[in-house]
From Swiss-Prot:
Organism listed in the record: Escherichia coli (strain K12)
Similarity comment: family membership: Belongs to the GppA/Ppx family. GppA subfamily.
GO biological process: guanosine pentaphosphate catabolic process; guanosine tetraphosphate biosynthetic process; nucleobase-containing small molecule interconversion; phosphorus metabolic process; response to starvation
Catalytic reactions of this protein: guanosine 3'-diphosphate 5'-triphosphate + H2O = guanosine 3',5'-bis(diphosphate) + phosphate + H(+)
The protein's name in its UniProt record: Guanosine-5'-triphosphate,3'-diphosphate pyrophosphatase
Designated gene of the protein: gppA
PANTHER family the UniProt entry points to: EXOPOLYPHOSPHATASE (PTHR30005), RETROGRADE REGULATION PROTEIN 2 (PTHR30005:SF0)
Pathway membership, UniProt: Purine metabolism; ppGpp biosynthesis; ppGpp from GTP: step 2/2
Lineage, opening ranks: Bacteria, Pseudomonadati, Pseudomonadota, Gammaproteobacteria, Enterobacterales
pH-related activity note: Optimum pH is 9.
Amino acid sequence: MGSTSSLYAAIDLGSNSFHMLVVREVAGSIQTLTRIKRKVRLAAGLNSENALSNEAMERGWQCLRLFAERLQDIPPSQIRVVATATLRLAVNAGDFIAKAQEILGCPVQVISGEEEARLIYQGVAHTTGGADQRLVVDIGGASTELVTGTGAQTTSLFSLSMGCVTWLERYFADRNLGQENFDAAEKAAREVLRPVADELRYHGWKVCVGASGTVQALQEIMMAQGMDERITLEKLQQLKQRAIHCGRLEELEIDGLTLERALVFPSGLAILIAIFTELNIQCMTLAGGALREGLVYGMLHLAVEQDIRSRTLRNIQRRFMIDIDQAQRVAKVAANFFDQVENEWHLEAISRDLLISACQLHEIGLSVDFKQAPQHAAYLVRNLDLPGFTPAQKKLLATLLLNQTNPVDLSSLHQQNAVPPRVAEQLCRLLRLAIIFASRRRDDLVPEMTLQANHELLTLTLPQGWLTQHPLGKEIIAQESQWQSYVHWPLEVH
């Protein structure tokens, strides 16, 4: 199928379930075509050393083989696959992801908890009506996301290490549904919540929205029992008493609760009761969408408001007193170079965005010291929270900044996994050249240049006589040409 396809797919490799959403873009909105969900319970396969068992990984791969069949009809640029808490935690996540990528034929991104929370919120903002100021709660298999925001804008983002699968293994391992099991699970959840409760309450909300399987299950129970859709603490306590009355997990029967959801329902319920109690939530409704919808709307660029990446870059520039004019100057030169070689090198739009982001932050190391500025820059970017960027993208930015000047460390460019190694090399070459030609820090001193790519050979053409008139510039370019040749990047300058 050609790249003009209007189909988009989002896959969420969760700790409890794997989900696939396939949609069609229709007049600036989305129409859901397919939703596939499989209980994989990946988190249950983690041992005490945080290694995933072979059985859990095989369950995951088996599910992805089903998804892969549907993905064949969709252009890879219109597919996003993200992995969350369990694969953030697992020491052997790389093994699972390598095979997952092979099965699906597209990249799998392990996203940070904050990025997961942001995407969930975006999904809610795009799909859920009601008041503008909201609190979003998503109880996953191994993490729980809590986000406040107004409109499309988040005001606080938290990803907490508790989920319905991990709490099941920890507090309901004996499969007893006793008062003491619930008490222990709720107490532990409240302790996890306590450090973030004040900030969430400070930002406040007019409406509380739940975006998880636990909340979906509650909705189904309430519908089956003829109740209204509003979830309240009173209803949660009634359901807890009903579960305790059943006595054992395998004997849990509640009207409207499906067998599929029953296993993790008590642990999810305990976490939700703790959230209601700790945050004094009056009532909650089910969200119209969450993580997968956030992914889809992000691909469609149907932003509700501003681009979070741009805001992140602006905040970092201000915080580290980066010369914004110079950052823009380098970005402009880099964008010009990129546009001249993108067809020959088959570069994608996301690569351009990441190159520009690297330009915006390239002088951040100077805030520490001129000596070893590239190393300082790489360290800062690797360790700063950068909302809007995945961990893999952060690593790529850090690697580009590490290699912005001096001899190239090729192995570092190959160790990032945001883009293919060859693309990382190409972006690095463009960044280095842009920095050199913008180094005089004045727009009128940036020469008119053409850059041509022929496979890996770059040919840079400067104005007649420029090299003669700029002896220092000539020396710097000769040195750069030599450094690039050391790593087999041919560069010719005329």
